[in-house]
Amino acid sequence: PKFNREQILRNLEESKLARESSKFKQYAAKEYALAEEIRYKNYWNEPILKIPKGSRPDPKTYVNSEYLTKHFAEFDEGATVIQTEWAYTNYSEANGFVGVPDDNTLFVMPTKYADKVIKNSNGNINYIEEKLGFPKGYFKYGGGLVRIDVEDLSDLDLRLPSGNETGANSMWIPGGETSGGVPEAILNTVPLDKTRVSRIGIK
C-alpha cells in the first residue's frame, strides 16, 4: 500500500499531543487533589483549635473515608512511640503498659517514619522534638530516649486523635499529623509484652 508521508507525520503529531494532554490531565488532577487536601487541612485547623480541649469534634465529622484509608495505610508496617527514659521507667515499665489509662490512648507514628526521624536527626534531640510536635527542651532532661515499637495493631483500635486526649499538648493540630509534619494516630494502651523496646543513642 502507498502511504502519504504528510498524513503519517500528522498522525504522529496528533498522537504526541494526545499523550501530552493525558499526562497534563493526570498532573492537573494530582495538583488539584493536593490543593484540596491543603485547603481542607487549613479549614480544619483554625476553627477546631479555637474549640477548648475536651469539646473538640470527632475527626470522622470532618475527614472523609478516603483520607482515613490513605492515612491508616501508613501504619501497615507497625506503629512507634518515643518516650524519655524517665517516662518509660516511671510510667510504662512501672505499669506494664504504654499509654494513658485515663482515656485509654497512646499517640503513635508509623514505624517507617520513626526510622526516618531518628536517622535524619543526626543525633540532634531538638530535631526529634520538633518533628514529633513537642516544645523545644521537652526531652532534654529525660535521661535519654526509648523507642517502643508495636507490630500488631489489629486489636488496638487505630484512629485519628480528636485533640481531646490527655496526651494532646498545646502543639496538637487536627488531621492526623504532628506540627512537625509526621503522620500520627492513637491506639488503645498496649501491654509492654506486646511491644519491642530499644534505646535510642541520643541524649
Predicted features and spans:
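Catalytic toxin/effector domains delivered as secreted proteins or via bacterial secretion systems
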Residues: 3-20, 38-203
